[in-house]
Amino acid sequence: MTMEAKAILRTARISPQKARLVADQVRGLSAERAVNLLKFSDKKAAHLIKKVVESAIANAENNQGADVDELKVKTIMVDEGPSLKRFMARAKGRGTRILKRTSHITVVVGAAK
């Protein structure tokens, strides 16, 4: 049986396209290295993903007694959440719909073999 722990952040107020740029950088890294990389990134998505990775590490440590030094980011997925529909006034009495996109961020950490 493989030891894995998971953490999910739902309806994060960031577009999936922007969040995937950061997620691709930490996929497959050791958990400690991933947190360090995210800590020094100035992107908004990095802060959100760092919190989810730290939560997954804490889940592995507390629920399954895993050694934090042996954990790595096995999978990280950014799926599209519900969009907030907003209205922007345009010329000649018209209006345009704006989509404020949200993301579901899922992180699975497990023991590196």
Curated annotation (Swiss-Prot):
Matches recorded under Gene3D superfamilies: Ribosomal protein L22/L17 (3.90.470.10)
Keyword Disulfide bond: no
InterPro entries according to UniProt: Ribosomal_uL22, Ribosomal_uL22_bac/chlpt-type, Ribosomal_uL22_bac/org-type, Ribosomal_uL22_CS, Ribosomal_uL22_sf
Molecular function in Gene Ontology: rRNA binding; structural constituent of ribosome
Record's keyword terms, sorted: Ribonucleoprotein, Ribosomal protein, RNA-binding, rRNA-binding
Gene Ontology biological process terms from the UniProt entry: translation
Residues that span the membrane, as ranges: none
Any one Gene Ontology cellular component term annotated for this protein: cytosolic large ribosomal subunit
A Pfam family reported for this protein in Swiss-Prot or TrEMBL: Ribosomal_L22
Keyword Ribosomal protein: yes
CDD domains: Ribosomal_L22
Description of how the protein assembles with itself and partners: Part of the 50S ribosomal subunit.
UniProt record similarity statement: Belongs to the universal ribosomal protein uL22 family.
NCBIfam families linked: rplV_bact (TIGR01044)
Protein function: This protein binds specifically to 23S rRNA; its binding is stimulated by other ribosomal proteins, e.g. L4, L17, and L20. It is important during the early stages of 50S assembly. It makes multiple contacts with different domains of the 23S rRNA in the assembled 50S subunit and ribosome.
Protein name: Large ribosomal subunit protein uL22
Species, as recorded: Xanthomonas campestris pv. campestris (strain ATCC 33913 / DSM 3586 / NCPPB 528 / LMG 568 / P 25)
Gene responsible for this protein: rplV
